[in-house]
From Swiss-Prot:
BP terms from Gene Ontology: thiamine biosynthetic process; thiamine diphosphate biosynthetic process; thiazole biosynthetic process; tRNA 4-thiouridine biosynthesis
Subcellular location(s) of the protein: Cytoplasm
InterPro entries: Rossmann-like_a/b/a_fold, ThiI_AANH, ThiI_fer, ThiI_N, THUMP_dom, THUMP_ThiI, tRNA_STrfase, tRNA_sulfurtransferase_ThiI
Protein's UniProt name: Probable tRNA sulfurtransferase
EC number from the UniProt entry: 2.8.1.4
Catalytic activity of the protein: [ThiI sulfur-carrier protein]-S-sulfanyl-L-cysteine + a uridine in tRNA + 2 reduced [2Fe-2S]-[ferredoxin] + ATP + H(+) = [ThiI sulfur-carrier protein]-L-cysteine + a 4-thiouridine in tRNA + 2 oxidized [2Fe-2S]-[ferredoxin] + AMP + diphosphate; [ThiS sulfur-carrier protein]-C-terminal Gly-Gly-AMP + S-sulfanyl-L-cysteinyl-[cysteine desulfurase] + AH2 = [ThiS sulfur-carrier protein]-C-terminal-Gly-aminoethanethioate + L-cysteinyl-[cysteine desulfurase] + A + AMP + 2 H(+)
UniProt lineage: Bacteria, Bacillati, Bacillota, Bacilli, Bacillales
Protein family membership: Belongs to the ThiI family.
Organism listed in the record: Bacillus cereus (strain ATCC 14579 / DSM 31 / CCUG 7414 / JCM 2152 / NBRC 15305 / NCIMB 9373 / NCTC 2599 / NRRL B-3711)
Entry-linked CDD domains: PPase_ThiI, THUMP_ThiI
One Pfam family from the record: THUMP
Residues reported to bind ATP: L184, L185, H209, F210, R266, G288, Q297
Pathway assigned in UniProt: Cofactor biosynthesis; thiamine diphosphate biosynthesis
Length: 404
């Protein structure tokens, strides 16, 4: 019986790019190669319009499972390759149709003749291929408007591709084409989703997490490491910077009026993150803020917090409600990690009545009474940095190291 030999990848949004399209295609190819590292027999050919993945005996389901998380892929089809002869095409179409899983009652045939010298025209091929499927199946009908399955045939010189198992990719742009940002990763539900959506726009991310021992636990720190690890499903790696924040928070609690302590804390986080961004050649800062969700996420608060950085602040969740954010968190695998009951530094010294309309002038006046610069310098200098990769890649590297 014929088996799937290829996966044909369609780019989606990348097709709108002009002269720099080759850069996008090259980056996507590199990302796919990295994602499929554990499949040594695979061959990848990336053209201007699509990507061809030759399986060479590798399990198509296992490969598909990893492909679906690669940004830059709009859709992909499992494909069979047959000689460009009518009988081979008919048998290939039937074999592909029979491998489709689920309750299938209707189908249609779509033919694209890239090879214009093929002796039959498209309108002649449609009844030939469709009739062959009808003759060899039961309780199946043709529906050209809303079929359960679309059997696609691409005829080329010498060979043809047969496809009907179409799967959705992650969409967006390949990670790496849009520069790098620093993501404030708190450990809650929102910030991992913000990181995910930032990566979807082709941007590489490094994460910054503020922890305040002994007020925050090692389990809270591990939760953030696990979140960063989960995000590596969608990129090559995530660099995580763990910033000690205890002394900064204790000083804020002592020196700043409680109503402004949350605002000043966020401003200090921005200052520290900007310093790390400069070190790491990042171009922006991403946060998980959603407008009006909590006191520190009003327009007034954001206006006051933004004052302390010259970097663009990207807020992918700004117009989403909590249920929308939770839905994405569940889909990308971060929700169950985020709801582990371990407190982060944002819950330490929480004021009873935080200002919802803080003013820049007041924040500056309160901060001017104490020199926070040495504390910021110390926090940046004492940060712990770790590089996280997908579990499969780490296992392969460890296996390689054991050989020596």
């Amino acid at each position: 019986m014929l088996k799937y030999e290829y996966i044909l990848v369609r780019y989606g949004e990348m097709t709108t790019k002009g002269k720099n399209r080759s850069k996008f295609v090259s980056t996507l190819k590199d990302n796919v190669k990295f994602k499929l590292k554990k499949f040594p027999n695979i061959k990848i050919d990336a053209t201007h319009d699509r990507m061809y993945i030759q399986l060479n005996g590798e399990d198509h389901e296992a490969v598909s499972e990893r492909l679906k998380d690669v940004f830059g892929i709009h859709k992909f089809n499992l494909a069979m390759k047959v000689p460009s002869e009518l009988e081979d095409i008919k048998e290939g179409a039937l074999a592909a149709f029979l491998q489709v899983k689920g309750d299938v009652k209707t189908f249609k045939i779509t033919v694209h003749r890239s090879y214009k010298r093929f002796p039959m025209r498209t309108m002649e091929l449609l009844p030939e291929i469709g009739g062959h499927i009808l003759e060899n199946t039961e309780d199946i009908t043709v529906d050209v408007h809303n079929p359960d399955v679309n059997v696609r045939v691409e005829i080329r010189s010498g060979y043809s591709y047969i496809m009907c198992d179409e799967r959705m990719g992650a969409g967006g742009l390949p990670v790496g084409v849009g520069g790098k940002v620093m993501v404030l990763l708190s450990g809650g539900i929102d910030s991992p989703v913000a990181a995910y959506l930032t990566m979807k726009r082709g941007v590489s991310v490094e994460a910054v997490h503020f922890h305040s021992p002994p007020f925050t636990s090692e389990r809270a720190k591990q939760k953030v490491i696990d979140l960063a690890q989960e995000l590596t499903k969608y990129c090559k790696r995530v660099t995580l910077h763990l910033v000690p924040f205890t002394e900064v928070q204790k000083t804020i609690n002592k020196e700043i009026p409680s109503s402004y302590s949350m605002t000043v804390m966020r401003r200090m986080m921005m200052r520290i993150t900007e310093r790390i961004a400069e070190e790491r050649n990042a171009l922006a800062i991403t946060t998980g803020e959603s407008l009006g969700q909590v006191a520190s996420q009003t327009l007034d608060s954001m206006h006051t917090i933004n004052e302390v950085t010259n970097y663009p602040v990207i807020r992918p969740l700004i117009t989403m409600d909590k249920l929308e954010i939770i839905k994405i968190a569940e889909e990308i695998g971060t929700y169950d990690i985020s709801i582990r009951p371990y407190e982060d530094c944002c819950t330490v010294f929480t004021p009873a009545s935080p200002a919802t309309k803080p003013k820049r002038e007041k924040a500056n006046r309160f901060e001017a009474k104490y020199d926070f610069t040495p504390l910021i310098d110390e926090a940046v200098a004492n940060k712990e940095t770790m590089v996280l990769q997908t579990v499969e890649v780490v296992a392969e590297e460890e296996k390689f190291e054991e050989l020596f």
